[in-house]
From Swiss-Prot:
Job of this protein: Binds to actin and affects the structure of the cytoskeleton. At high concentrations, profilin prevents the polymerization of actin, whereas it enhances it at low concentrations. By binding to PIP2, it inhibits the formation of IP3 and DG.
Lineage of the species this protein comes from: Eukaryota, Viridiplantae, Streptophyta, Embryophyta, Tracheophyta
Protein name, as recorded: Profilin
InterPro entries named in the record: PFN, PFN_euk, PFN_sf, Profilin_CS
Species per Swiss-Prot/TrEMBL record: Ananas comosus
Description of how the protein assembles with itself and partners: Occurs in many kinds of cells as a complex with monomeric actin in a 1:1 ratio.
Length: 131
């Protein structure tokens, strides 16, 4: 299966009639493995800051998580495993695997729990596969 198929079929899938606003799978070096058409144009330093928070949990809390210039308030995640952010009625979930970051961005009516489930389920599967 191609990386794009993981984004299209697993991240952008429909859940209770809803789906993520955008999603991507990125390498730890900020390279795009696959992304949805409307995934934000991000800066490498934004991805570096996200990776730093996985190594040093809490480092994003004072400044917020930025993706494509959009600031998300960091909310409870799982240190070193998952980072979650909130902005208005939407938010972001980032799951780290050995080689990649799985990123899902959502807005209402999708719920944070639905976004977390989609992103973390794929991340867990990729970890089991050695990625």
């Amino acid at each position: 299966m191609s990386w794009q198929a993981y984004v299209d079929d697993h991240l952008m899938c429909e859940i209770d009639g809803q789906h993520l606003s955008s999603a991507a799978i990125l390498g730890h070096d900020s390279t795009v493995w696959a992304q949805s058409p409307n995934f934000p144009q991000f800066k490498p330093e934004e991805i570096s800051a996200i990776l730093n928070d996985f190594e040093n949990p809490g480092s994003l809390a004072p400044t917020g998580l930025y993706l494509g210039g959009t600031k998300y308030m960091v909310i409870q995640g799982e240190p070193g495993v998952v980072i979650r952010g909130k902005k208005g009625t939407g938010g972001i979930t980032v799951k780290k695997t050995n080689l990649a970051l799985i990123i899902g961005v959502y807005d209402e009516p999708m719920t944070p729990g639905q976004c977390n489930m989609v992103v973390e389920r794929l991340g867990d599967y990729l970890l089991e596969q050695g990625f």
